[in-house]
From Swiss-Prot:
PANTHER family: BIFUNCTIONAL INHIBITOR/LIPID-TRANSFER PROTEIN/SEED STORAGE 2S ALBUMIN SUPERFAMILY PROTEIN-RELATED. Gene3D superfamilies: Plant lipid-transfer and hydrophobic proteins (1.10.110.10). The keyword Membrane applies. One of its GO terms (molecular function) is lipid binding. It comes from the Eukaryota. Lipid transfer protein that promotes the number of phloem (pro)cambial and pericycle cells. This is Non-specific lipid transfer protein GPI-anchored 30. Glycans are attached at N44. Pfam families: LTP_2. One of its GO terms (cellular component) is side of membrane. It is a lipid-anchor; GPI-anchor.
């Protein structure tokens, strides 16, 4: 029961942060983040990967690899570090769930035969999604900090 309240509170805070930022959120990025929410404790320093994290992560790897590309970008990595997320642990997460992810594929996807307008649109979407990931990381860190104070 207590765990359910924590997750409910977590989602309420995320929605408030997203609404207050005025940013555009597309369905794909929200879906991706919702699927990876069970991994947040691990990304905030818990050394054991929760079992409930691996299946959603495997689904994202197979069905939405662009999500992982956004999360391993230099911009997201530096912002995640500032928010207290161990980026090395985040990068090791797929392997700890028994999955292999090739980060070179992210470069191949981004350099595919797209036009300049496609690229500029992609850059705008990537910025928006990176901003959302940073907001998520900060919200998770604040919640974790508040939980430690209350406990």
């Amino acid at each position: 029961m207590m765990m359910g309240m924590k997750f409910f509170s977590f989602y309420v805070v995320l929605l408030l942060v997203a609404a207050s930022s005025g940013m555009r959120i597309n369905g794909q990025s929200v879906s991706c983040l919702n699927q990876l929410a069970p991994c947040l404790n691990y990304l905030n320093g818990t050394k054991e990967v929760p079992q409930v994290c691996c299946n959603p992560l495997k689904s994202v790897i197979r069905n939405n690899p662009e999500c992982l590309c956004r999360m391993i970008s230099n911009r997201w990595s530096s912002q995640a570090e500032r928010a207290g997320i161990d980026v090395n642990d985040a990068q090791m997460l797929p392997a700890r769930c028994g999955e292999h992810v090739n980060p070179i594929a992210c470069l191949t996807r981004s350099r595919g035969g797209s036009t300049n307008s496609d690229r500029s649109s992609s850059i705008g979407n990537t910025f928006s999604q990176s901003y959302w990931m940073t907001t998520l990381a900060i919200a998770a860190t604040v919640l974790s900090y508040c939980h430690h104070i209350i406990s």
